[in-house]
Amino acid sequence: MTASYLPSILVPLVGILLPAVTMASLFLYIERDEIL
């Protein structure tokens, strides 16, 4: 199976990228809200 290595790459990637994107969008939302 060629896709057997995919989860071992995808899981850490999602585990790192998802919180990073969530924190970044939340930070920008708070900053923009305070400026206005």
Curated annotation (Swiss-Prot):
Places the protein is found: Plastid, Chloroplast thylakoid membrane
Keywords: Chloroplast, Membrane, Photosynthesis, Photosystem I, Plastid, Thylakoid, Transmembrane, Transmembrane helix
Predominant location: plastid
Membrane topology of this protein: Single-pass membrane protein
Pfam family, one: PSI_8
BP-aspect Gene Ontology terms: photosynthesis
Alphabetical list of SUPFAM superfamilies matching this protein: Subunit VIII of photosystem I reaction centre, PsaI (SSF81540)
Source organism, top-level taxon: Eukaryota
Residue ranges of coiled coil: none
Transmembrane spans: 7-29
InterPro entries (UniProt xref): PSI_PsaI (IPR001302), PSI_PsaI_sf (IPR036357)
GO cellular component, one term: chloroplast thylakoid membrane
Family: Belongs to the PsaI family.
Function: May help in the organization of the PsaL subunit.
Protein name: Photosystem I reaction center subunit VIII
